[in-house]
Amino acid sequence: MLAECRPGDPGLPLAITMSATYWRSAAQDAAMQEEHRFVWKAMLDTIDTDLAGTRVLDVGCNRGGFLRLLADDCGIKEGFGYDPATSAIEDARRLAGTRPLRFEVAAAPPSGWNGFDVAFNHEVLYLLDDLPAHATAIFRALKPGGVYYAVMGVHAASPLMATWHAKNAEAMGLPALYELDQVAAWFSDAGFQVAAGRLWIRFVPIAAEHLDEARLLDVLDYYYNQKILLRFSRP
C-alpha cells in the first residue's frame, strides 16, 4: 500500500521526493513496506471479515507486500493491486512468485476489475484529488455485500499530520487535508454504509527520528487515537 511517507520509520511523514517509478525510491519503498507491517497486522486484527477464499483489491499497492501477506497468512483466493508507480509494480510482479496475485500500473481500478469481496488501502485517501470519484469507482469494483477498509491518519483532525501537511503539501502537490466527516459523507453519497473504528495496535515501533520531531506521547496518540480504520460496506 502507498503512503505514509517518512524514510526510516513506520509511518510518520517527512518531506520526501516522489518518483514517477517509485513512491520514493526502490530502497525506501522496500523499507517502507516492512515498516508498515505492524499497521497491516493491526488492520487484520481489527476487521470483521474472514478473508479465506476471497478476491481482494489493494488500492495503492506499491510493491505488493500487503497482498503477499494476505496470500501467505489469510488464504485469499486472488489478490489484485494497482499503483501509479511503474517500477514498484514491476517489483510487485516479481516478488509475487507463484502466489495468485496480479498487479497493474494505474491510478484507479483498471477496466474489468470488479466483483471483489474486499478492498483495502493504507493511507491513500489523503493523496487523491477527487474522493467522490474514487468512492464511486470502488463501489463499482466491489460485488454486492463487499467491503472496503481504508486506514486514514492523515486528515484535518490529526495535529501531527496537519503540521506535516502544511510543510509539504505544495512540494508534493497534495490536496487540502480532508475532514473525516466529509470523507464519510462522500462515501455514503456513493452508496456505501459507513462505519469507523480505531486500529487494534499493540506496541508501536519508535525510531530515534520520531523523537526529534514529536514527543513520544504525541506519536502514540497519533497511532491509537487519530489513525482511523474506515469501513465502507456495499449493500
Give the residues covered by each predicted segment:
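A C-terminal cap/extension of S-adenosyl-L-methionine-dependent methyltransferases
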Residues: A162-T163, A195-P235
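Conserved class I S-adenosyl-L-methionine
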Residues: M1-D50, L69, Y149-L174
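Short catalytic micro-motifs in class I SAM-dependent methyltransferases
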Residues: E123-L127
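A conserved beta-strand element that flanks and buttresses the S-adenosyl-L-methionine
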Residues: F120
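Short alpha-helix
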Residues: P175-G191, A196-G197
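A short glycine-rich, Lys/Arg-flanked "PGG" loop and its adjoining helix->strand segment in the class I
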Residues: P132-P144
